[in-house]
Amino acid sequence: MEEEDEEARALLAGGPDEADRGAPAAPGALPALCDPSRLAHRLLVLLLMCFLGFGSYFCYDNPAALQTQVKRDMQVNTTKFMLLYAWYSWPNVVLCFFGGFLIDRVFGIRWGTIIFSCFVCIGQVVFALGGIFNAFWLMEFGRFVFGIGGESLAVAQNTYAVSWFKGKELNLVFGLQLSMARIGSTVNMNLMGWLYSKIEALLGSAGHTTLGITLMIGGITCILSLICALALAYLDQRAERILHKEQGKTGEVIKLTDVKDFSLPLWLIFIICVCYYVAVFPFIGLGKVFFTEKFGFSSQAASAINSVVYVISAPMSPVFGLLVDKTGKNIIWVLCAVAATLVSHMMLAFTMWNPWIAMCLLGLSYSLLACALWPMVAFVVPEHQLGTAYGFMQSIQNLGLAIISIIAGMILDSRGYLFLEVFFIACVSLSLLSVVLLYLVNRAQGGNLNYSARQREEIKFSHTE
């Protein structure tokens, strides 16, 4: 205890205000990197936060990066292959409601993050063992366990961000976290196929053992994320002791009875969300073989094209977030994003144009939609219902992804890629119709969702007077 008190006194003696004014630090004061009230220390924490979710996002799309190898080595059709994505989504139909509750009331942010990181690690290891032992059911079970940790770990990551950066660069932090997530997905898409070929050359043959070893090596990223979770827990506990700050909480209040009070605009936002994302993530999950078969690309080139959505999303998400913040007009931006996605899918389905064009357009529209759609929930729901609204939105998104992943696999097995693309076009068209309906309903109700940034500022100012 005496050492802890000395550390706290040393840090407080050389506080950030003195350092910012250029005053000399008190004797015995620790370096800025060790002081939880200083920017340098917060940047260290930010680095750990970004890598906290890296393993989860890297391994989520392992099946997409190894689609050909998984189907060949495990001798499964596309329908069974897509179950690897469906099993990830099923637990999150329920857990989206309770992830925040578990972090706030049961585990706490530190233990919650460690536990969810362990689920991610164990799930990936079981997934890899399924390949090594040629047991596809074990791979499915591994993806289920992986899913239990994956989405809840993202909630924990956001909770840490708010705890450390609220009022201090928070929007930038969220943008950087999203960018790191997309980098993880991109690295996976371009690395795993190459890694498989190297292990195949080393072992002298392809097969389920080669697949399992490749997935096990990919799981090292999950161990890296677990190490970050442990380091964050230590630093957060240390900061709480030194600065007497409270442990971070999600602030979510989930009341399922609030669902009956949801307005028509909110239900339309839910429909837009589900119909849009089911035409993006399952497509990426199946995209590699599509680019190989239709356009004649090599496996490596097909992986690069398939990952371009994430490549573009990494730098553009913060840019589009700033753009929407500065301009407002959320519905118009959502309309542009959904329309551009529809054009992208139509180009891929009905033309032989270079798919880089369509995929770059899809990457831009995907980034724009996330920045414009999700904040709209806060404009149509009272603050005390936000946790329920976002939980419900994520829940039905995961339900949609689970069901559509299976349907997409069945369509591809029975009808081929053209029919699958027509199916995705139908989903995006339904999303576009919902955006138009949202615009009309919102206009009839006063138009608050489509206010400009200036109008929102004026209304906010008038309410404070």
From Swiss-Prot:
Cellular localisation: Lysosome membrane
Pfam families: MFS_1
Coiled coil: none
UniProt region (Disordered), positions on chain: 1-23
Catalytic reaction(s) noted: L-alpha-aminoacyl-L-arginine(out) = L-alpha-aminoacyl-L-arginine(in); L-arginyl-L-alpha-amino acid(out) = L-arginyl-L-alpha-amino acid(in); L-arginyl-glycine(out) = L-arginyl-glycine(in); L-alpha-aminoacyl-L-lysine(out) = L-alpha-aminoacyl-L-lysine(in)
Superkingdom per UniProt: Eukaryota
Membrane topology according to the record: Multi-pass membrane protein
Cellular component GO terms, alphabetical: lysosomal membrane; lysosome
Sorted UniProt keywords: Lysosome, Membrane, Transmembrane, Transmembrane helix, Transport
Any GO BP: protein stabilization
Principal location listed in the UniProt entry: membrane
Motif Dileucine internalization motif, residue range(s) on this chain: 11-12
Regions crossing the membrane: 39-59, 83-103, 113-133, 135-155, 170-191, 213-233, 266-286, 303-323, 331-351, 361-381, 392-412, 418-438
CDD domains for this protein: MFS_MFSD1 (cd17340)
Any one GO MF annotation of this record: dipeptide uniporter activity
Subunit comment: Homodimer. Interacts with lysosomal protein GLMP (via lumenal domain); the interaction starts while both proteins are still in the endoplasmic reticulum and is required for stabilization of MFSD1 in lysosomes but has no direct effect on its targeting to lysosomes or transporter activity.
Protein's job: Lysosomal dipeptide uniporter that selectively exports lysine, arginine or histidine-containing dipeptides with a net positive charge from the lysosome lumen into the cytosol. Could play a role in a specific type of protein O-glycosylation indirectly regulating macrophages migration and tissue invasion. Also essential for liver homeostasis.
Domain notes per entry: The dileucine internalization motif is required for lysosomal localization.
Protein family membership: Belongs to the major facilitator superfamily.
The protein's name in its UniProt record: Lysosomal dipeptide transporter MFSD1
Organism taxonomic ancestry: Eukaryota, Metazoa, Chordata, Craniata, Vertebrata
Gene: MFSD1
